[in-house]
Design a protein with these regions (language model features):
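Membrane-proximal intracellular helices of multi-pass ion channels
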Residues: 1-294
């Protein structure tokens, strides 16, 4: 359905590049599967309607089709059968069917809250740059794409290379990517941890972490180590490469290196041209892609 809608003339600019149905099918699959691969840039092929459809496809992929169907069922006051609950439990990576409905609504609340907050931060840069309407829309598009780790943007054909040294865009998008890649189970654990710490105020910080799941511990510790190690390695490998970050100051070099480390594991955005990166750096990026997210 998504590919058919994107292939219709009403979804295209009047002067958009000539495309076939297979091009739109490829883009649709890439959006729903949140891979970030595209045979035609979103900004050149699709108008406002096409880009809204693209956002919906990415959001569907990020949340998962099973959870969307279940959410719709619960919203319509209907009940899920046992087989449907088993499917939803598996889709949400839950060990139990207890409180599936409440857990699902938490997932949606977390998703839309993080996307909205990050979009507001991005708007502080995009509204002065693109104007009110386009600034808000472009911010929402980028926020949805980044949180869902989809890797698409509607800003041009160079990904985020024009914003390589822009701290607002880099940090906001990196935060969204990390938030989406951690997984909802980790986020729910983090929220419960913060509530427990605020409410009980344990004298020893370690006491607040005791109910934290082993999965959350593993994901957070490994993510921190990979980000720190990956950033330093990418910086050391590229710091003298004038085609990538060699002409930037140290803080800008670290910012670019950090962003590549974040996006390589799951998202697919880019603030440098990887064809200009050193072979050893691209090898590092390949290893990060193999490792992936939480």
């Amino acid at each position: 359905v998504g590919s058919i809608l994107l292939s219709l003339p009403i979804s295209h600019y009047a002067n958009s590049p000539e495309t076939s149905y297979l091009d739109h099918l490829f883009n649709t699959v890439s959006m729903v599967c949140v891979t970030g691969l595209s045979v035609v840039p979103v900004s050149k092929a699709y108008n406002g309607l096409g880009q809204i459809l693209s956002m919906l496809l990415m959001q569907t992929g990020g949340l998962g089709l099973v959870s969307l169907i279940a959410f719709s069922t619960y919203t319509l006051k209907n009940k899920l059968g046992l087989s449907d609950q088993d499917l939803l439990q598996s889709a949400l990576s839950r060990d139990t069917q207890k409180d599936l409905k409440a857990y699902l609504f938490k997932v949606y609340k977390i998703t839309f809250s993080i996307e909205a907050m990050a979009a507001l931060v991005i708007m502080t840069d995009f509204i002065p740059r693109f104007g009110l309407g386009h600034g808000i829309f472009n911010s929402l598009f980028l926020a949805v794409s980044a949180f869902c780790n989809a890797g698409f943007d509607n800003l041009g054909s160079n990904s985020l290379q024009d914003y390589a040294t822009n701290p607002t865009i880099n940090l906001a998008v990196a935060f969204l990517i990390m938030s989406g890649s951690l997984g909802f189970a980790v986020w729910i654990d983090l929220i419960q941890l913060m509530r427990r710490y605020i409410k009980d105020r344990p004298r020893n910080w370690k006491l607040a972490w005791r109910p934290f799941s082993n999965q959350s511990h593993l994901v957070l510790i490994s993510t921190g180590c990979l980000l720190l190690g990956g950033t330093l390695l990418a910086w050391l490998l590229e710091m003298d490469n004038s085609k990538t970050i060699g002409t930037l100051n140290v803080w800008q070099q670290l910012l670019v290196s950090f962003f590549q480390t974040v996006t390589m594991r799951t998202a697919g955005f880019a603030t440098i041209s990887y064809t200009n990166a050193d072979f050893s750096t691209n090898l590092l990026f390949m290893i990060q892609m193999i490792i992936g997210g939480g």
